[in-house]
Amino acid sequence: MLEYGLTVLVAVSAAFFIFFKVRTKGGIVTATKALAAVSFVTLGFVALSKSPGKAGFIMLFGLVLGMVGDIFLDASHVCPEEPAFLSVGMAAFAIEHIAVFAAVNVACGFSPMYFGISLAFGAATALAVLFAVRKKMDFGKLFYPAVIYASLLTATTAYYIVMTVIGGLAVTLAIGAGLFFISDFIILFILFGGKDTAKMNVFNLSTYFAAQVMYAISLGGLAAKV
């Protein structure tokens, strides 16, 4: 019951955050986002407490970093004169992705062959898509960094799906990875494609919070494998 209650709390607080995000600025935006972030970390802790294990603790560390990233990225909008907020937020999210990857490999074991295939698939797919839309988007000097990020994002998502099928990884983690994939690709179009609209931001944030909830729920499933 507690897990259901926390899931509802994440959904409600995220809905309030998204509502305020597309309509206003200021402390209420950061406060509601922080509440949603704290809620999905707490949900992860509760899920992990039912079946603790090394992989689950690594995943929980990733969720905490996601919470830190959330708070600092929104603080960077409230206090744009503090450039360190943006850097800390981006670094926290980068380490969260690394923590999730580490947790998956602790839970299921690392497969160089399947990861290599996923990496090749990710690179080919990202290159094909971004080159196809390049003329419609303004990447500036960030085109190749965007290609690298999109390649890794696609590769890890594909790898998690493979490990769900052959390695017994929690299905909720693969779903979460897929939602993160959608959310982050939307960000590319928001930043470089002139799609910074209320509708796109709502879609981006909705898939992001849904991804974090899926990650949190998966902690018990991850821990059961180690």
Segments (PLM) and residue ranges:
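Polytopic alpha-helical membrane-helix bundles and their juxtamembrane interface segments
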Residues: 1-226
